[in-house]
Amino acid sequence: MKAIFALRQAVASQLKKSTASSHPLPRTTASTSQDETIWQKIHRSRFVRIAHPPVMLGITVVSLTGVVGYRFYNQPQLSVGTESPYTIYAPEDGSFVDERTTEEKRKEVRAGTIPRLQRDNELTAQLKQERSQYLDAINQLRYLAGTFPYIDTKIFTLEQQHLLRSLGPGEWQQLEDYISYGQPLPMASPQLAKLQQLFDQQKATTSPETMAGLLTSIRTAQDRYGRVTARLAEVKADRQITNNQIGALKLDGPTWQTTQQTIIQVHDRILTQGLPAGITAPLLGETVQLHLRNILPPQAHQVAENSLNNLLKDKYNLTVDKEATKNLAEKAVLAMENVKVSAEKNSVIVRAGEVITQEQFVLLDGYGLSQRQVNWQGLLRTAGLVGGALIIFCGVSRRIHRPLRRRDHILLCLLSVSTPVLFLLDPVYNNLPAISLLTSSFYGPTLAITQVVLVGGLSAFAMESIVWEYLLGSAAAALLAGMIASKLRSRDELALLGVGVGATQGIVYLFTYLIVNASAVTIIWYTALPSAIVYGLLGLAWSAMAIGVSPYLERLFDVVTPTRLVELSNPNCPLLQRLAKEAPGTFQHTLFVACLAESAARELRCNVELVRTGTLYHDIGKMHDPLGFIENQMGGPNKHDEINDPYVSVDIIKKHVSEGLVMARRYGLPQVVRDFIPEHQGQMLISYFYIQAKEAAERAGEPPVNEEEFRYTGPIPQSRETGIVMLADSCEAALRSLREANPETAMAMVNRIFKARWRDNQLQDSGLKYEELPIIADVFVRVWQQFHHQRIAYPKAALDVQVTSPSTTRF
């Protein structure tokens, strides 16, 4: 018996070695050759694990310090704003260009260029159309009001006739009663009293028949004028325009025709000369009065003046000719001479104790007297600033439980260094939005936003003079990309985000430029707007570049984006199709575990896409021997009963982890997805075969069974996502077996499993808190209830097929 036991132990040991050789640690690359095995040993060595963090930190600090502190490599000791330690004389005659002052002058010239204007034909046609509509409305009102004057002006003047037809019904009735019956006017208004005297004079010189005709004409005119007032009330026109139209009704026909033609001519003349935007009302009024001087009688003049002021108020037909303005500005810049600073031999450049000015610095630097050298203090300050930024970044990474690998450190270092480099070359072409979009897609929004703030600050420190419009524009666009990119699930959504990034970058640039250059706000739009559009297009271009380079970075640095995870979770992927075909029971088990884990991940705000994808691939290793797992036996004989050896059986079970890793590497699955294969089992005890072996050893009087041989080799879950999948995988079989149980029974079983995993220290490195376990348990039971919902039983008669017509029966 002891010999049999020794042989069994040897076989098991050999199988274990075979398994271990194909099951390296999850953070390493697959290896088959002896050289690769040596590399893996070095990679996993304690020395490398201890030395890597400080070495990588040092490389990152040196790289960023070298870029951010570039201006300290050759920095003048005698610069603008410093005191000269001694009096310095010009060694010879010299003249040097002041580049800084020259560039400032060029900016002033560009900003101060008076814009070229051009007449906009569309706006001109639109204003003429508005004029036609305005005059047509007056003509329609005059038509409704009828002929004016409606009585001979020798009898009543135009003003008196307009007053008579505009009387209200009550006032006219009082006046008519007085004229016809001699009834006195009660409390007559001044205008009624005036009309009373007028009719007294007419009655004295006019026959009753003529007076009756006059009254009839007045009533007709009042009726027609009432329609006019009703029309004006219906359209609810602007009160000022209404008054102008009523004023036009007071003119007789010939006078109105002359007034109308004058309005058209003056309006055309002003539009031909050009009407600029922003002209004030007093200035517009003076222009109109100048054109109308001594042309019309007083009342018609007032109608024309008011009409023109209303037609032209807040209107314009002159727009900026952007191309001509830009060319004019560039010509002015080219015509401008460089600002030069000159000095004669032995003349004093700066005296001892005097603060050096820009002009003096140009001379010192031109003569080579500015004492340029490496500013070690500046470099040390830069290194301290970079080190502090890295500490903050690492602290945030640990805070959100986002462990980073060596290749992650390298990628983040390269991305972070690229931005200050581009800022130094030209702030216009900085790639802050691109690195934010990539970091957010690979590592989440928190790290992306942290990186944007820190790298943006370092880039600002790297520049000798901060160009705020470029820095703030790119930073705002980068923050937008960092917040949103990790939530997008398709290339189309990322492309739309790129448009938003470009628009944000251009808009923030424009407003920052306006704030910084507020002194030239009247003409700044014409020079800043084209630059803002170009800068916005650059933001779009960086986003497109980030989207395009993302798949290559995913492969090169073994990182994933949400889009990549969605693609991997597609059931049409070759590996998932193989799993569904070769191990259908395992595939169904995987789907149920995915439902459990995904729901829990969503509840705990974990990476749902990663959990879904990792769960779908966590048991692919079972394809190496599908019948070795009960879910694939479909009610057939149990393979392990035929083997009847717990050591062989446990090696078959454990091998699904090592073989799964081999398959995952062969199909190019990312590391974060491969991590689910070993970590979902952790170092759990395969208790069924352990107890079987233990009982067999006790019956045979053999030495105690080594428990480690019946445990998975691990590692235990290293993230919240793999920890959730471990719990879901452990509970799946137990919940599936509960068909008629109530939720309380299911909850009790889930809690027992959770406590067993917690006490076995399987979750200690996962980041899951003990207080979160009841939340996960509640989610699991809720999903179980959804799967095992009750359905009504169909009556037997409903299942019987009744043939009504042979011709309609199909088999």
UniProtKB/Swiss-Prot annotation:
CDD domains: HDc. Keywords: Cell membrane, Membrane, Transmembrane, Transmembrane helix. InterPro entries: HD/PDEase_dom (IPR003607), HD_domain (IPR006674), HDIG_dom (IPR006675), Metal-dep_PHydrolase_7TM_extra (IPR011624), Metal-dep_PHydrolase_7TM_intra (IPR011621), PgpH_phosphodiesterase (IPR052722). Residues 586-734 form the HD domain. It comes from the Bacteria. Residues 16-35 are annotated as: Disordered. The chain crosses the membrane at residues 50-70, 376-396, 409-429, 442-462, 466-486, 496-516, 529-549. One of its GO terms (cellular component) is plasma membrane. It is found in: Cell membrane. This is Uncharacterized protein slr0104.
